[in-house]
């Protein structure tokens, strides 16, 4: 029996009333994963034994009636550490790495008796926008298996969209939650930088990385964020939790809310059908009582260039730890220490990871630092200031999540620049450390279109309020791909 069409609240009621047990729900989730996994390749590891053991322990002590997520399974992106469960970052470099600790976000979820069902596939070390750079093969889009699911949190999005799990965790460095959420027609939130601890997240770009949430609905997304958000002494960039309940404004109307629509977000490079869908969504927000006005974010056009200098520079530093000495893959054909380093990194990293390490090393090198890395930091400040000017007069910013719907597998992965430009609309949010959400807003060419809502720092409850108002008066989130059990 499958429970994948039940909401979290419905599952909670079934668990509390003992109509089902946590063990039965976990086994049903494992069955849902197995039934769909060959088609989507969303998981690197299904932690069947550990999950059932965790569920049994929860059943023995009893479901907590006051804890909505007690006994609920969830999936975790494979760059987020899980105690005793392989955490590979979808790389040959970490093919055998089992952490001996949980990331703080995972520990927080387990403390609320959530059950880790497995680790999801992803672009290697979170470097990619299509789910195709994984050592374990490409993840497929839940709606059309010939299309990409987006990246880098490809498996976390596809798993939720295909009905394998109800909730999952991902990470977002330049759009890696929001873009796959858009491509798969689900809800994905990147919180304000520092809201969720990065302790236990395998670092890519430390000033950009943020753990976030995937779900079927806006409310369930907020419910999961309630559990994982926390200040953490183990992460010096974590911030005090300023919002007691991220669901607090869900259900409130948005009359009088001021929403900005940047002209740059609907300009050159945006698919005409995507543009039309977003303009229709803007009109819908106006019908709900909000004011939508055009604004300008003039420096957003530099976001991709700034991001790939800063993120690659940080990656070149962060990935120095993978050297074949301490843990993970080690090349066998080494004759000396230099050979260990060179051969291990040459064989252990994929092409995209090597490309970004080289770009970052170049940007930080003597003679180029000022021209590239320092200049990128200066333009990043201008991008932040653009947002601050808009948020002085507006509550939220609205736009498409991605310039297009999901594209064909094995196309843009041969054109790095074109792939990078797919993150054009999400990258500025990371550069500014802002929260952003993608929600389903319609369809183009038979594939989901994502609507992005961006707010000032620590405005997640307002973002959820607006997103939930849109969701409650549309039915896009109710439409499901065939693999889930839908008619599409």
Curated annotation (Swiss-Prot):
GO BP: any one term: translation
Top EC class, one word: ligase
InterPro entries from the UniProt entry: Amidase (IPR000120), Amidase_CS (IPR020556), Amidase_dom (IPR023631), AS_sf (IPR036928), GatA (IPR004412)
Catalytic activities: L-glutamyl-tRNA(Gln) + L-glutamine + ATP + H2O = L-glutaminyl-tRNA(Gln) + L-glutamate + ADP + phosphate + H(+)
Gene3D superfamilies on file: Amidase signature (AS) domain (3.90.1300.10)
Keyword terms: ATP-binding, Ligase, Nucleotide-binding, Protein biosynthesis
Function: Allows the formation of correctly charged Gln-tRNA(Gln) through the transamidation of misacylated Glu-tRNA(Gln) in organisms which lack glutaminyl-tRNA synthetase. The reaction takes place in the presence of glutamine and ATP through an activated gamma-phospho-Glu-tRNA(Gln).
UniProt name for this protein: Glutamyl-tRNA(Gln) amidotransferase subunit A
């Amino acid at each position: 029996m499958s429970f994948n069409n039940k909401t979290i609240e419905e599952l909670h009621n079934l668990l509390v009333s003992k109509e089902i047990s946590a063990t039965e729900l976990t086994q049903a989730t494992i069955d849902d994963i197995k039934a769909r996994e060959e088609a989507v390749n969303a998981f690197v590891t299904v932690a069947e034994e550990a999950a059932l053991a965790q569920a049994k322990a929860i059943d023995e002590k009893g479901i907590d009636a006051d804890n909505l997520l007690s006994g609920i399974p969830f999936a975790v992106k494979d760059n987020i550490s899980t105690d005793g469960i392989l955490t590979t970052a979808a790389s040959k470099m970490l093919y055998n790495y089992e952490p001996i600790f949980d990331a703080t976000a995972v520990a927080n979820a387990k403390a609320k008796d959530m059950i880790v069902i497995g680790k999801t596939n992803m672009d290697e070390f979170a470097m990619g926008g299509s789910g195709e750079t994984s050592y374990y093969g490409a993840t497929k889009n839940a709606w059309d298996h010939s299309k990409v699911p987006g990246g880098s949190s490809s498996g976390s999005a596809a798993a939720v969209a295909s009905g394998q799990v109800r909730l999952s965790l991902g990470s977002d460095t330049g759009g890696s939650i929001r873009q796959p959420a858009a491509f798969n027609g689900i809800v994905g939130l990147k919180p304000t930088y520092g809201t969720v601890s990065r302790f236990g997240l395998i670092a890519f770009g430390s000033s950009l990385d943020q753990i976030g949430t995937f779900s079927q609905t806006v409310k369930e997304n907020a419910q999961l964020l309630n559990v994982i958000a926390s200040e953490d002494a183990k992460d010096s960039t974590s911030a005090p939790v300023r919002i007691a309940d991220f669901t607090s404004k869900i259900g409130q109307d948005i009359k009088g809310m001021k929403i900005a629509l940047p002209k740059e977000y609907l300009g050159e490079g945006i698919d005409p059908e995507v543009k039309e869908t977003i303009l229709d969504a803007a009109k819908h927000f106006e019908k709900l009582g909000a004011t939508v006005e055009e604004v300008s974010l003039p420096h957003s056009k530099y976001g991709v260039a700034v991001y790939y200098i800063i993120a690659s520079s940080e990656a070149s530093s962060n990935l120095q730890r993978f050297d074949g000495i301490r843990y993970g893959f080690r090349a066998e054909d080494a004759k000396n220490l230099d050979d260990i380093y060179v051969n291990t990194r040459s064989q252990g990293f994929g092409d995209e990871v090597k490309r970004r390490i080289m770009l970052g090393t170049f940007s930080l090198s003597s003679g180029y630092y000022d021209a590239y890395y320092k200049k990128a930091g200066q333009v990043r400040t201008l991008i932040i200031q653009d947002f601050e000017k808009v948020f002085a007069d507006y509550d939220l910013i609205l736009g498409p999540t991605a310039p297009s719907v999901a594209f064909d597998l094995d196309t843009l992965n041969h054109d790095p620049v074109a792939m990078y430009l797919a993150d054009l609309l999400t990258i500025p949010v990371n550069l500014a450390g802002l929260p952003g959400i993608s929600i389903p807003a319609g369809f183009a060419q038979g594939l989901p279109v994502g609507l992005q809502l961006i707010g000032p720092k620590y405005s997640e409850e307002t973002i959820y309020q607006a997103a939930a108002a849109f969701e409650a008066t549309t039915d896009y989130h109710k439409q499901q791909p065939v693999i889930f059990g839908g008619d599409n």
